[in-house]
């Protein structure tokens, strides 16, 4: 089968002929229709320090996808040949305390599709049936292929009550932009998103952000005054991993504010902890998606009218995968879809 593999311990990714994956009694074999390129895939492509420590070489990568079930393990129930599915990319152990308590997104033994095991940048993928999610008929393949990052946005945004609240999102990557759309859809008052990438800020405006602020050109506190905000942000969603952005968030949060953090800093990050203490802030770390509450909410949000389609800006056939990675690397894109049909 065709597959994109991290074939060498250097920058790049390679289109190869790989063996079709073998499945077990509890697995599904999925014929991939579309995949999307994630920021994690770009880390792997660029072979940065994290990738060098984490990714086995060679390995098929990728974890954002939609496909069709073409074979079913003999112990599997609830799925049929022809079902259209995406899937949870975090494979959990099932036996740790959190798994047994139903908090599988907090499994201490999580293995990542396309990170620790063979991924979805291939014509076929095998995953445990437990991890598969049936896609409703009224949700397109394009949208289904980005359910993984959309789930990060939904999990982060819905961590706290948003109705009538003022929300600050730091980092206008695709996940931050989708989070802005979610916040507006569920009833937030002002949704302000910050970045320095004007292309992505314009995407955020199209997706419903009240204000998309280029912090290299505008002062966040001036924007708050223009919006008539007299206190501070009630909810903060940190999506950038940039220390200066997080410090700006701490400066502008209201007392008693709540922060959900998805962005991963490049190293240790110093902050003024007295602001956290004296403001009584709550900080929650976010990793992945809640299984499978987030997945059901994703489908319901789209079915209730949330439009995240503008975040998809580029489509390529798999043979043109290099153009897709170049588009992602340029910073002048939203989500990039690769078609395997």
UniProtKB/Swiss-Prot annotation:
Binds 2 Zn(2+) ions per subunit. Zn(2+) 1 binds at residues 38, 63-64. Its EC number is 1.1.1.103. The keyword Transmembrane helix does not apply. PROSITE patterns: ADH_ZINC. InterPro entries: ADH-like_C, ADH-like_N, ADH_Zn_CS, GroES-like_sf, L-Threonine_3-DHase, NAD(P)-bd_dom_sf, PKS_ER, Zn_alcohol_dh. Zn(2+) 2 binds at residues 93, 96, 99, 107. The record marks 148 as: Important for catalytic activity for the proton relay mechanism but does not participate directly in the coordination of zinc atom. Signal peptide: none annotated. It catalyses: L-threonine + NAD(+) = (2S)-2-amino-3-oxobutanoate + NADH + H(+). SUPFAM superfamilies: GroES-like, NAD(P)-binding Rossmann-fold domains. NAD(+) binds at residues 175, 195, 200, 262-264, 286-287. One of its GO terms (biological process) is L-threonine catabolic process to glycine. The active site is at 40 (charge relay system), 43 (charge relay system). Belongs to the zinc-containing alcohol dehydrogenase family. HAMAP family: Thr_dehydrog. This is L-threonine 3-dehydrogenase. The gene is tdh.
């Amino acid at each position: 089968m065709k597959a994109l593999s991290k074939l060498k311990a250097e920058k790049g990714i390679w289109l190869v002929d790989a063996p079709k994956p073998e499945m077990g009694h509890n697995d599904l074999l999925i014929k991939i229709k579309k995949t999307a390129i994630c920021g994690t895939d770009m880390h792997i492509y660029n072979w940065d320090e994290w990738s060098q420590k984490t990714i086995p070489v060679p390995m098929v990568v990728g974890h954002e996808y939609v496909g069709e079930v073409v074979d079913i393990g003999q112990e599997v129930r609830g799925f049929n040949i022809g079902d259209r599915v995406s899937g949870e990319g975090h494979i959990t152990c099932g036996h740790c305390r959190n798994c047994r308590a139903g908090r599988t997104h907090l499994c201490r033994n999580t293995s990542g599709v396309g990170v620790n095991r063979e991924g979805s940048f291939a014509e076929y993928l095998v995953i445990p049936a437990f991890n598969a999610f049936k896609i409703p008929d009224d949700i397109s393949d394009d949208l289904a292929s980005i359910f993984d990052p959309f789930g990060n946005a939904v999990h982060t945004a819905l961590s706290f009550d948003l109705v009538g609240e003022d929300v600050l999102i730091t980092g206008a990557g695709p996940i931050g932009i989708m989070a802005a759309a979610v916040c507006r859809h569920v009833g937030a008052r002002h949704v302000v998103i910050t970045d320095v990438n004007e292309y992505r800020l314009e995407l955020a405006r199209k997706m419903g952000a009240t204000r998309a602020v280029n912090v290299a050109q505008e002062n966040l506190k001036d924007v708050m005054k223009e919006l008539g905000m007299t206190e501070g942000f009630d909810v903060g969603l940190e999506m950038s991993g940039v220390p200066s952005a997080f410090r700006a968030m701490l400066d502008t949060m209201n007392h008693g504010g709540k922060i959900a953090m998805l962005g991963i800093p490049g190293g240790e990050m110093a902050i003024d902890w007295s602001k956290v203490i004296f403001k009584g802030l709550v900080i929650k770390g976010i990793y992945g998606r809640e299984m499978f509450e987030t997945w059901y909410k994703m489908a319901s949000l789209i079915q209730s009218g949330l439009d995240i389609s503008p975040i998809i800006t580029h489509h390529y056939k798999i043979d043109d995968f290099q153009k897709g990675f170049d588009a992602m690397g340029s910073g002048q894109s939203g989500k990039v879809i690769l078609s395997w049909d």
